[in-house]
């Protein structure tokens, strides 16, 4: 059995290309901002995403529900290229209460989450796949590493208020998430969702701040 497993692993690796940087550490080449997020590259090559602090608040005659929709309108940064089978590795940092995510195979490019008003029934987490990144966001039971709405990660895998490494394997019949070296979640995938598409980084709401570094991809043929 051990020899069979090793043989399968060897075949899998033989069809995988070398690791390549998905973010060059200098600018946003190869990426497309979606929504009103402010994306920049810091001096050390870290990718910083935040929302505009000078954004106009809603008018004073809005209802509570309209305000909630305004507050939670999303912003994203997507790869221009699309991918089907691959390994993705990156490190992320969120402040206390921060909420972000990684979209997989999202051919909608978050169209429904960034429009006015947003349609939260068709966000990337529901249209395609989203890997949750969550540093204690109030009321959200999906811990970091969860495949949102499909497979929940256990609590305690994330290092609070520090950099965390997440590794995602995307195959035809499985999505697998490893957070800080520990298995977080697995799911066989949903045949009703896209089989290929871009990769996206999320700014969940109008107060989100997130940082990313060492973003790499290994395409599997």
Predicted regions and their residues:
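Sec-dependent signal peptide recognition
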Residues: 1-7
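Carbohydrate-interacting regions of secretory-pathway proteins
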Residues: 17-221
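Hydrophobic h-region of N-terminal signal peptides that target proteins for export
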Residues: 7-16
């Amino acid at each position: 059995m051990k020899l069979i497993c090793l043989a399968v692993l060897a075949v899998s690796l033989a069809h995988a290309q070398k690791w390549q940087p998905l973010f060059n550490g200098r600018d946003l080449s190869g990426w497309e901002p979606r929504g009103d997020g402010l994306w920049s590259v810091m001096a050390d090559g870290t990718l910083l995403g935040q929302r505009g602090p000078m954004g106009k608040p809603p008018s004073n005659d809005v209802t509570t529900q309209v305000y909630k929709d305004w507050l939670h309108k999303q912003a994203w940064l997507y790869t221009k290229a699309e991918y089907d089978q691959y390994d993705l590795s990156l490190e992320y940092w969120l402040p206390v209460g921060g909420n972000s995510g990684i979209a997989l195979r999202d051919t909608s490019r978050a169209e429904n989450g960034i429009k006015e008003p947003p349609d939260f029934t068709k966000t990337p987490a529901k249209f395609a796949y989203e890997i949750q990144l969550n540093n204690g966001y109030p009321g959200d039971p999906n811990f970091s590493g969860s495949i949102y709405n499909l497979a929940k990660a256990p609590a305690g895998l994330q290092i609070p208020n520090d950099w965390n490494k997440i590794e995602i394997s995307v195959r035809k019949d499985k999505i697998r998430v490893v957070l800080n070296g520990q298995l977080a979640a697995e799911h066989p995938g949903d045949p009703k969702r896209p089989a290929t598409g871009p990769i996206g980084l999320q700014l969940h709401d109008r107060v989100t701040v997130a940082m990313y570094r060492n973003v790499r991809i290994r395409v599997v043929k």
